[in-house]
Amino acid sequence: MASLTYDLTLAGLTVGSAAALTGMGLVVTYRATGVLNLAHGAIAMVCAYLLRQLVVEWHWPLAPAAALTLLVAAPGLGVLLDVLVFRPLSVQGNDPARTLVASIGVFVLLVGGAALLWGPGARADAPALVTGEPWGQLAVVAALAALVVTVTRWTRFGGELRAVVDNRELAALGGIDTDRVASVGWAFGAFTAGLTGVLLAPYVRLDPYGLPLLVVEVIAVAVIARMRSVVVAVVAALLIGVAQAQLTRLHPAGRAEPLVQAVGANLFVVALLVAALVLPGVGTRDALSRTTVAAVRIPPAAWLVAGVLLLLPLGFAGSDLHTSVQVPALAIVLLSLVVVSGRGGQISLGQTAFAGLGALFTGWLSQSVPELLALLLAVLLVAPLGLLTGRPAIRRHGLALALATLAVSVATSRFVFAQPYATSGLTLTRPAGLGDDRAYYAVELALLACALLAVAALRRGRTGRALAAMRDHEEGAQAAGVPVPALKLVAFVVGAALAALGGGLLSMGLRTFDPGAYDPVRGLLWFAAVVVLGADNLLGAPAAAALLVGLDAGTRGGVAAAAVGLLALLVGRFPQAHEVLSRWRRPPKPPPATARKVYALPAGPAPAAAPELAAHGVRLSYGSYTVLAGVDLAVPPGRVTALVGGNGAGKTTLFHCLCGTLRPDAGRVAFGAADITRRPAHARTRLGIARTFQRIAVFPSLTVEENVRIGAEQGRVRDPAAVEQALRLMGLAGGVRRLPAAGLPTGTLRRVELGRALAGRPHTLLLDEPAAGLDTAEAEELARVLRALAADGMAVLVVEHDLDLVADIADTVHVMRAGRIG
């Protein structure tokens, strides 16, 4: 028993040391650049192939081949990626969404390129750099960890690295060469990736898809380390590796045996799932940037051409449509990304899980019920599983959400699709009468048309506008009354249903369930393809499906991945291309109006009927620093109340407590007799509390009228004239109402934001520095509007630094100092 424990521990240390190298590389790269390098596994795979090429094919000695691979090629690839891709992105603002798209593009490009160069098959003759004993690997890991800790803590470069991590712009102003720091980080990260690939290749399948996925799984150790601590990453990797090895000795009897064995063989996947779904996430931004998902106006002729191309196989192809039947099914799967990522802006890398589950459930159920009924039931069963990724999306943003969705995909692949207990003996048959490829293809086209119409209706309607608002500006959407958490769940559930429908059709068309068709690497490829062809465009999904299927069928394996990866990299690197396309065929702007008339609000309820918003003893602290120290404030109806004070006085914090975006530690917020302290922002909006933002919160992808309409729809205003009245009041009733909000002048955008707030017919209006960015004439116009609103009985609170504006409009002025009103 002791000998077995020792042997298993050694095996676990071997795996854990490779995982530790990955963790170190990811942490150092992230600390130096702010980029979570999802292409780490692909770099590892390329280096493993390069070493094999040098040693096995070209008969180089191992030592010089390893030196060239690890000390020249791997760091050189890292520096190349930094200089050509990620450094320009950091100069342009380091948008996490664009960086993620570029990183996925690099991953897919390297995987596709490797498949092109070396073929998609597995290789079993990779050279071993060290012996089978783990001590050599452990020594390398310990030495590298000690080097990283020493450099980061006790050298000048370490101080520069910490400065860049804390504030890259300020570090550059302080004379630090941030580009050099980033290049060193990328070189070291690529070196550890190459070393990981070289060490793992002799013991696993060396193929373009398997090895990158293995490295992706051990991202868990970097997440556990919060992307900051090399020591924590190394310790976590070694512990998980040893625990995974020890679990292989468990052989419980009964139905639990396959599951226990699966967990024992995939403990890093379990760790990734827990780290991604339970531990606090990394990343801050929640949505794909608007330039990345920008919708291109599609002329009717393009739809006509697409329809003709999809119908061509029915008339001109032979009876064997094996390739063609994949296109409509895959297009439906990719439509799920149009809903979730394109319209909703949520980064989802796990749609392969839902597509595969749709195929799997269809196969299971078709053994008992007719095939079409089995497909329908599969869709209904898989749709609620969208909550697995939708729930984390409520709290997780950006990179954290990407990791959560990727973790769900990896776990589903390892614990369901790859297990014999789930897929052994599974066959899929087509419905009666659809055995012929032509008939089946025609049914697929009909279902694709229905799916396109359903998604088009969703995008054009109230829900579609709310999704676009959530994508463009989540806090602004909440302020407009959009129930963002519920809407995210809806997007992921609808996306799961579409993916399940497409997955079921795809496997029925091929008459088999192929786990490889739904592996996580393919999910990254699907995501990249949809982003490349326009994530918010309905035509993008069929086009991406045709591109992927056509290239894979008509060319050497890997062409589709390489092409899509290159295009995704370029889209992440040059998002302006999508921005230019989004302006295509946009109607010309009308000439600017020479004057804007401000209309009085129509007569409304008596002012006495409006509830009073009040804060009672509100306290809030950040650690030991007290921001609000028992603040009392009332915002009475029919009056303009102003809140002024110096920077750091607590004005904005109190404002957020009133809006619902912050919850106080003590005290309460009341609206009339109701205690609304615990109510979220969108719920307060629906009570009649509207707000604007210091930094303008409009939805650039929507027109001016759609921006205002969201305020009425989400505020549940039943009067159809509410939108028109708000547009007229703010001087937006002319041709400007049909223009997208993107690119409009600041003064116009301020009026759009205020018009959206007023369209909800609020009782109380909260304004955070509403005059910011306005010229004198625009500020005077704003003052007239606010006085008119108060005269009509509305309660108005203004947080403002412009004391002239405050003196002009305020009935009551409160001064804040050090978290108190006095």
Question: For each predicted feature, which ranges?
Answer:
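The feature captures the beta-strand-to-loop junction immediately N-terminal to the Walker
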Residues: 644-646
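A short, surface-exposed alpha-helical micro-motif characterized by mixed small hydrophobic
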Residues: 806-808
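Conserved ABC transporter NBD signature motif
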Residues: 667-674, 687
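Transmembrane alpha-helices and adjacent helix-loop boundaries
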Residues: 15-18, 22, 41-44, 91-126, ...
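Catalytic Walker B motif of ABC-type/P-loop ATPase nucleotide-binding domains
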Residues: 765-769
